[in-house]
């Protein structure tokens, strides 16, 4: 049983779909579930009765699971926890939530393996210590990939009626879509978590 924790609901959806596709190819009988604030009560009850091979969730939803009466039974088969985008959580209240959850899980799961994933960590040693604690039993894997990166800023054709409030920037959606469709891999940067969620849903639609 594996648990994947991600800071964004939008990212959780993408990860669940990607891991399920991989499982369909390698382990067709296994399922990867999704648990966020948007998950219905019926689906939550089903997940509790019949846990999947893997669960993708957020720090807040993990704490909801840990507050359930029979949570130790639910997590007794847990072997691996993956913390995605650790740099986003590190040093924040939500990061502390993750640290507390991991400490508690370790108290009744003796051989729990924890993975931290990040593409932009400045101080790897500090990030590792906060995530794993004082242990010498760890490995660091660094990817050495050389890529040709092109950065393009998308600006409105006119600034006369620029919407500084509300759905800031969404009027540029058609231009951004053209760029995404032209390339195999595209990163869209937003300033806040809320904007990331907004753009994710808008691009899907």
PLM features: residue spans?
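Loop/turn-to-beta-strand initiation segments
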Residues: 1, 31, 51-54, 60, ...
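Conserved nucleic-acid-binding Ia/Ib motif block in the N-terminal RecA-like helicase ATPase lobe
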Residues: 1-57, 61
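Residues immediately C-terminal
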Residues: 10-11, 61-64, 88-89, 123, ...
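Alpha-helical scaffold elements adjacent to nucleotide-binding pockets in ATP/GTP-utilizing enzyme cores
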Residues: 14-22, 61, 65, 77, ...
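Conserved catalytic network of the ASCE P-loop NTPase/AAA+ motor domain
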Residues: 24-28, 46-50, 71-76, 95, ...
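Conserved C-terminal RecA-like helicase domain
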Residues: 26-33, 193-205
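SF2 helicase catalytic motif II
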Residues: 60-63, 69-109, 113-114
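Conserved interdomain linker/interface between the two RecA-like ATPase lobes of SF2 helicase motors
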Residues: 103, 111-197
């Amino acid at each position: 049983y594996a648990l994947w924790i991600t800071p964004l609901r939008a990212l959780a959806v993408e990860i669940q779909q990607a891991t399920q596709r991989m499982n369909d190819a390698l382990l067709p009988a296994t399922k990867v579930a999704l648990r966020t604030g948007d998950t219905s009560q019926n689906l939550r009850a089903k997940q509790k009765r019949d846990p999947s091979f893997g669960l993708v969730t957020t720090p807040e939803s993990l704490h909801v699971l840990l507050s359930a009466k029979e949570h130790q039974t639910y997590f007794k088969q847990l072997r691996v926890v993956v913390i995605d985008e650790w740099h986003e959580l590190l040093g924040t209240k939500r990061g502390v939530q993750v640290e507390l959850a991991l400490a508690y899980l370790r108290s009744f799961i003796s051989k729990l393996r924890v993975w931290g994933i990040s593409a932009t960590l400045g101080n790897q040693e500090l990030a590792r210590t906060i995530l794993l604690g004082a242990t010498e039993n760890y490995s660091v894997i660094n990817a050495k990939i050389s890529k040709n990166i092109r950065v393009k800023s998308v600006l409105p054709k006119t600034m006369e009626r620029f919407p500084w409030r509300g759905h800031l920037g969404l009027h540029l959606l058609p231009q951004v879509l053209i760029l995404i469709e032209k390339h195999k891999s595209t990163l869209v940067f937003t300033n806040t978590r809320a904007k990331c969620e907004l753009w994710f849903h808008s691009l899907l639609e």
